[in-house]
């Protein structure tokens, strides 16, 4: 299951992670975000040993989304070795996201 990450825990959970990290930036009021949630949960289970999957509520945590230029949600961002590798904006299908993750880790 995808865990939550906050502005305060981001450095430890994401930038210092030994595994690549997928961060789903979302908000309660965002319908496409709610549609993406079950897909993110499935990816979290399917790729558990390869990728850490985290979710960040942008309304509760405005600092990190601002730092990384999040302007639309849902946005998923992939980090590896403490660096941002790639970003996808909008609602995507599970297979498309898994292929994208595998190509970037």
From Swiss-Prot:
- Name by which UniProt lists this protein: Thioredoxin
The species this protein belongs to is Rickettsia bellii (strain RML369-C)
Q: Name one Pfam family in it.
A: Thioredoxin
Give start and end of each Thioredoxin domain. Answer: 1-105
Q: Which InterPro entries match?
A: Thioredoxin, Thioredoxin-like_sf, Thioredoxin_domain
What task does this protein carry out?
A: Component of the thioredoxin-thioredoxin reductase system. Participates in various redox reactions through the reversible oxidation of its active center dithiol to a disulfide and catalyzes dithiol-disulfide exchange reactions.
The similarity comment for this entry is:
Belongs to the thioredoxin family.
Q: Per the record, what is one GO cellular component? A: cytoplasm
* UniProt keyword Transport present: yes
Read off the lineage from the record: Bacteria, Pseudomonadati, Pseudomonadota, Alphaproteobacteria, Rickettsiales
Q: Report the domain of life of the source organism.
A: Bacteria
Query: Encoded by which gene?
Result: trxA
Q: Which UniProt keywords apply?
A: Disulfide bond, Electron transport, Redox-active center, Transport
Cysteine pairings via disulfide bonds: 30-33
Q: One GO molecular-function annotation for this sequence?
A: protein-disulfide reductase activity
């Amino acid at each position: 299951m995808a865990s939550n990450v906050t502005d305060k825990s981001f450095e430890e959970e994401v930038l210092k992670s030994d595994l690549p990290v997928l961060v789903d930036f979302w908000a309660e009021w965002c319908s496409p975000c709610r549609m993406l949630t079950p897909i993110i949960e499935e990816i979290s289970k399917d790729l558990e040993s390869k990728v850490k999957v985290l979710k960040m509520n942008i309304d509760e945590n405005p600092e990190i989304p601002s730092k990384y230029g999040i302007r639309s949600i849902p946005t998923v961002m992939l980090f590896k070795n403490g660096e941002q590798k790639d970003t996808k904006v909008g609602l995507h299908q599970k297979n498309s996201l898994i292929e994208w993750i595998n190509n970037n880790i």
